[in-house]
């Protein structure tokens, strides 16, 4: 049986990346297009799909407000434009989604927030909470403080990192190109679009040209890098041309696109990632905690009897039973020093012991392999 392309209607958690050229044109913000996208988001949510939007456009929007000249901007100018544009971008999303009863939340991140384990855990916890509360997070690269990210325009990779961080099963890159081609279709009339990519091979990567529009900075190479990150994390990814009204509806109805097939599901990919890490310490638990962990529960401080090693928040640790038998691995939400202090205590006592409020679980079940 031939491999089937993913169906956007079946997505449980969908990340949509919106390129600058789609949001902003010579006249400013494309509000009518954004309102049409809001219809797509509202429709997806009625199907039970959780939606996260990763949006470019703050610099492109801000530079018009500040009347900056066309062409490349100095780093400081880009950061200033981002500071002005982020406010207007967040307001625009709020205005088009609010009529559908959708609450938006602005989340500003950089690639470092997903690559550093401690910050990764914090970002993940925040996003999970926002989704659980029924919001649509609007994620934007924090171009006001970022440096390399501004120079290289990496929101494609950022979107893939966000998709993996939140365990999304589908990522859609709305772009100014309608898929991945064997060559640059603007230069080679014989270039063919791939409808479905099962494996990203070196030969396929070599086909990636570097088409760059006047407003967006991400070329096809960054999209292939994003696809590699996404599919390895169990998330299917599509590249599609998004300028049409209701671009997600168009994708659903068979618009031109390239789908990159996921390697397994997001949770399994995450478990493999955690299991491959080298432990920085060991947390030994009592018999009651063993039963709770085997039943799929999180590890609470009350079940901890000993802490070994020197580890920080977000570091991988080994989880051992009363006799030292290895039960699994997980990412700890506390440092070794903090874990020693709260070991054996109820979660409600954490504030009194540490002097500040922390997570209820020492290791959350989603950050654990047993």
From Swiss-Prot:
<dbReference type="InterPro" id="IPR019797">
    <property type="entry name" value="Glutamate_5-kinase_CS"/>
</dbReference>
<keyword id="KW-0028">Amino-acid biosynthesis</keyword>
<comment type="similarity">
    <text>Belongs to the glutamate 5-kinase family.</text>
</comment>
<dbReference type="InterPro" id="IPR002478">
    <property type="entry name" value="PUA"/>
</dbReference>
<keyword id="KW-0963">Cytoplasm</keyword>
<keyword id="KW-0641">Proline biosynthesis</keyword>
<dbReference type="InterPro" id="IPR005715">
    <property type="entry name" value="Glu_5kinase/COase_Synthase"/>
</dbReference>
<dbReference type="Pfam" id="PF01472">
    <property type="entry name" value="PUA"/>
</dbReference>
<dbReference type="InterPro" id="IPR001057">
    <property type="entry name" value="Glu/AcGlu_kinase"/>
</dbReference>
<feature type="binding site">
    <location>
        <position position="56"/>
    </location>
    <ligand>
        <name>substrate</name>
    </ligand>
</feature>
<dbReference type="InterPro" id="IPR015947">
    <property type="entry name" value="PUA-like_sf"/>
</dbReference>
<keyword id="KW-0067">ATP-binding</keyword>
<dbReference type="InterPro" id="IPR001048">
    <property type="entry name" value="Asp/Glu/Uridylate_kinase"/>
</dbReference>
<feature type="domain" description="PUA">
    <location>
        <begin position="280"/>
        <end position="357"/>
    </location>
</feature>
<feature type="binding site">
    <location>
        <begin position="175"/>
        <end position="176"/>
    </location>
    <ligand>
        <name>ATP</name>
    </ligand>
</feature>
<dbReference type="InterPro" id="IPR041739">
    <property type="entry name" value="G5K_ProB"/>
</dbReference>
<dbReference type="GO" id="GO:0005524">
    <property type="term" value="F:ATP binding"/>
</dbReference>
<dbReference type="GO" id="GO:0003723">
    <property type="term" value="F:RNA binding"/>
</dbReference>
<dbReference type="GO" id="GO:0004349">
    <property type="term" value="F:glutamate 5-kinase activity"/>
</dbReference>
<feature type="binding site">
    <location>
        <position position="155"/>
    </location>
    <ligand>
        <name>substrate</name>
    </ligand>
</feature>
<protein>
    <recommendedName>
        <fullName>Glutamate 5-kinase</fullName>
        <ecNumber>2.7.2.11</ecNumber>
    </recommendedName>
</protein>
<feature type="binding site">
    <location>
        <position position="143"/>
    </location>
    <ligand>
        <name>substrate</name>
    </ligand>
</feature>
<dbReference type="InterPro" id="IPR036974">
    <property type="entry name" value="PUA_sf"/>
</dbReference>
<dbReference type="InterPro" id="IPR036393">
    <property type="entry name" value="AceGlu_kinase-like_sf"/>
</dbReference>
<feature type="binding site">
    <location>
        <position position="17"/>
    </location>
    <ligand>
        <name>ATP</name>
    </ligand>
</feature>
<comment type="pathway">
    <text>Amino-acid biosynthesis; L-proline biosynthesis; L-glutamate 5-semialdehyde from L-glutamate: step 1/2.</text>
</comment>
<keyword id="KW-0547">Nucleotide-binding</keyword>
<keyword id="KW-0808">Transferase</keyword>
<dbReference type="Pfam" id="PF00696">
    <property type="entry name" value="AA_kinase"/>
</dbReference>
<dbReference type="GO" id="GO:0055129">
    <property type="term" value="P:L-proline biosynthetic process"/>
</dbReference>
<keyword id="KW-0418">Kinase</keyword>
<comment type="function">
    <text>Catalyzes the transfer of a phosphate group to glutamate to form L-glutamate 5-phosphate.</text>
</comment>
<dbReference type="InterPro" id="IPR011529">
    <property type="entry name" value="Glu_5kinase"/>
</dbReference>
<dbReference type="GO" id="GO:0005829">
    <property type="term" value="C:cytosol"/>
</dbReference>
